Amino acid sequence: MRALDTLGFMAGSKTAPLTERGLATRKKFTLALADLLCSYSVSEITVKEIVVRAHSTRQTFYRYFTSKEDVLHALLADLYDECYDRVLNSSGTTFEDYLVVYFSFWRERYSRLHAIMQHNPHWLFNEVAYTYNRRFYPKIKGLWATELLDERGEQYFQNFIFGGLSHVHATWFAQGCAQSPEDMAHYVAQCWTIYKQSEE
């Protein structure tokens, strides 16, 4: 099941079966919206404009999406799915290794995302994005003694890790990704090391 469905964004929508052709059609709409977001805020964009940019029809649009917000969520979901797959398939073995892959992914896309965020500043770093970042937890939880935590403690631990990562990511983007992915990964990993040393 795709993460988009898991988060309930497609619940109740009239989605067409996601065959290979269906996925390609769906992708046309998300890419069309991405193009428009580089010049306009989402509040200014209409379904008609998305349809025209995708060279499609409203009838086809509503087979896959219920609204422009639905397309926006799908675009964000696709982006984080791609990042997740990159990290998941990496050869990293440490938290810092995974962070290098994570920050490298986003830096490669900075120019395009920066253009979008000039008109939609809160699009990339929001509750949806934070929810997606939490998907990395099974990949990295073995790096810490999380078995010592009860259910509530583990939930707070995830909030600590991924809430912090989301804010660091947002700050890095706001500063134009001036630091390299390797430097960013080291900074974040070093913060964790300092925290652990303070306990000893």
Specify the residue positions occupied by each region the protein language model found:
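C-terminal peripheral helix-coil segments that are non-catalytic and often amphipathic
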Residues: 2-10, 171-200
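Secondary-structure edge/capping motif, primarily at the C-terminal ends of alpha-helices
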Residues: 86-90, 113-117, 144, 172-176, ...
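Amphipathic alpha-helical packing segments from all-alpha helical-bundle domains
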Residues: 101, 122-147, 152-167, 193, ...
